[in-house]
């Protein structure tokens, strides 16, 4: 497995992996597939030196991706980022998400990050278990904030401090 910065030519595969996650209703509140065009601005908001998007390659195929997103976008939150991880169906349960999350934690200090957050549906047990296994703790609970196919779903906010202030 090779983790690298995403480049614009990866965007079509990033979108395809994201769209493949929608039908399960586990990982995103989007209900319909998103378009390549609708994700171009999102892609360009990321920077390899600040809020990167990484892809994980397995045998030259993109098996999954991770993005860092600014938390609330206000200056006082500059050292906090939300992370999102999506894995292609063929590569789920193969360690791709684990490798991406490990890399995110390891590289966070170099990105100026002290806190990582994950907003995870309460019924997404695989993701909750993954984040727990890396020492993330439950920092918040948002009851019934999403409605997926007529079912109200809760969000759990998982957090981890990466380095303490001196």
Regions found by a protein language model. Give the residues of each.
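Conserved acetyl-CoA-binding loop-helix of GNAT-fold acetyltransferases
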Residues: 87, 93-106, 128-133
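Glycine-rich acetyl-CoA-binding "A-motif" of GNAT/NAT acetyltransferases
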Residues: 61-65, 126, 152
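Conserved catalytic-core motifs of GNAT/GCN5-like acyltransferases
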Residues: 70, 75, 117-120, 137-154
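A short beta-loop-alpha structural element at the N-terminal edge
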Residues: 2-14
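Acetyl-CoA-dependent GNAT
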Residues: 8, 32-90, 101-102, 161-163
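Conserved GNAT acetyl-CoA-binding A-motif
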Residues: 108-120
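Conserved GNAT-fold acetyl-CoA-binding loop/helix
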Residues: 15-42
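Conserved beta-strand-loop-alpha-helix junction that forms the acyl-donor binding cleft
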Residues: 92, 118-128
């Amino acid at each position: 497995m090779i983790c690298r910065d995403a480049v614009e030519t990866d965007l079509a595969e990033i979108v395809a992996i994201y769209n493949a996650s929608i039908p399960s209703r586990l990982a995103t509140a989007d209900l319909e597939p998103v378009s390549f065009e609708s994700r171009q601005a999102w892609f360009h908001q990321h920077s390899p030196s600040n809020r990167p998007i990484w892809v994980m390659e397995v045998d030259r195929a993109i098996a999954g991706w991770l993005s860092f997103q600014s938390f609330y976008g206000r200056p006082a939150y500059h050292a906090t980022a939300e992370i999102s991880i999506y894995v292609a169906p063929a590569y789920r349960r193969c360690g791709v998400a684990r490798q991406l999350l490990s890399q995110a934690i390891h590289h966070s200090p170099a990105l100026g990050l002290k806190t990582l957050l994950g907003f995870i549906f309460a019924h997404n047990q695989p993701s909750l278990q993954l984040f727990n296994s890396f020492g993330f703790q439950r920092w918040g609970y948002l009851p019934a904030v999403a409605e997926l196919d007529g079912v109200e779903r809760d969000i759990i906010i998982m957090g981890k401090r990466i380095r303490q202030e001196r």
